[in-house]
Design a protein with these regions (language model features):
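Tandem repeat scaffolds
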Residues: 3-6, 14-17, 38-251
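N-terminal intrinsically disordered, low-complexity tails
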Residues: 15-31
Length: 251
């Protein structure tokens, strides 16, 4: 039985977005500098620059209906729409997508390296065999993405305030990735590789985690009675966190 009703999910995500926007308005210059320094430790991102006018590949993504085997570098988009664009086997390096509308956009066999995606709209977006490497994703509601071929992999990334409510992520990867305030409620997470990842206030409830790899992962809080764990692999000392759910104290 679902832990949370499906209809409650949009309210949850709206609350997250409002909180992110409020936090951004309240940040002092010193706080913003610290956040940038924290992110750089995880991402080691390249400096974003505007594309050169004379580079044929350096065009704004979305200006073409279909792009295949193209490389996009250091492109910055803010509050623009890439509606219905199709990208196949493309690589995005050092790009920033801030509040970009990716509704019904299709990404197939694409790779994002040192990229930043902030509060992007992904209603009906196809994310099929897409790899995110050393990238930061903030306030992304993956529940809105198309279920067709949904298969994102994350390596050395930072996911902050993202939602994977009721998503199917079987056999996907979250390797050496920081999962901060990220919700996995009611997800299918069989045989997922979480090795080396850091959980910070991440919600894992009502999930199927059978066969998943949590070895060398840290910070997770998983209730064995509220999740399926058959065949999942854990390592000490983090696995000792299960004891609190059965009323056992280790001194």
């Amino acid at each position: 039985m679902d832990i949370m009703q499906k209809t409650e999910q949009p309210d949850l995500f709206d609350a997250i977005i409002r909180e992110l926007e409020a936090e951004e308005k309240q940040k002092t210059p010193q706080m913003k500098q610290k956040n940038n320094e924290d992110s750089s430790n995880v991402l080691q991102r390249t400096k974003l620059e505007k594309p050169a006018d004379n580079d044929s590949d350096q065009v704004l993504p979305g200006t073409e209906t279909y792009s295949e085997r193209k490389e996009f570098s250091c492109i910055h988009t803010e509050a623009v729409s890439l509606y219905d664009a199709v990208y196949t086997d493309c690589t995005f390096t050092g790009c920033s997508f801030n509040k970009t509308d990716l509704t019904n956009t299709t990404f197939t066999d694409c790779t994002f390296i040192n990229c930043e995606l902030v509060m992007c709209r992904i209603d009906g977006t196809t994310i099929d065999s897409v790899q995110f490497k050393s990238s930061r994703l903030t306030g992304i509601n993956f529940t809105e993405a198309s279920e067709y071929g949904f298969s994102p992999d994350f390596t050395d990334c930072l996911l902050d305030s993202c939602v994977f409510y009721d998503n199917t992520l079987n056999h996907d990867c979250f390797i050496n990735t920081t999962l901060r305030n990220t919700d996995f409620t009611n997800c299918r997470l069989k045989n997922v590789d979480f090795s080396g990842s850091r959980f910070q206030s991440a919600g894992i409830l009502g999930c199927n985690l059978e066969g998943s790899d949590f070895r060398s992962a840290s910070g997770y809080s998983i209730d064995p009675s509220a999740n399926k764990l058959k065949g999942a692999r854990f390592s000490l000392p983090e696995a000792a966190s299960f004891l609190k759910y059965i009323g056992v104290t280790v001194e």
